[in-house]
Amino acid sequence: MSRLFTIKLISNTKDSLVYDIWDEDRNEYVNQIEVSKKDFSYHLKSNQKLSNSYESSAFRAIKRAISMNVAPKEYSDGWG
């Protein structure tokens, strides 16, 4: 079974990007993540550490976006 996550841009400032993370297969909100553009540190709204594949995949996608100096309004990817 394949799994699909979507991140939706909430905020783009000079210091960070904030995205909502969604489980697209179930159409469920997973969490919100803020990632620093300077050092890739992150803060999750409801957890202290990345705790599932949706959060870790979203974090990797956001780090790639920051490295490319972009902030997509929405991005989806999956695995499985």
What are these regions, as identified by a protein language model?
Residues 3-33:
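N-terminal acidic leader/helix
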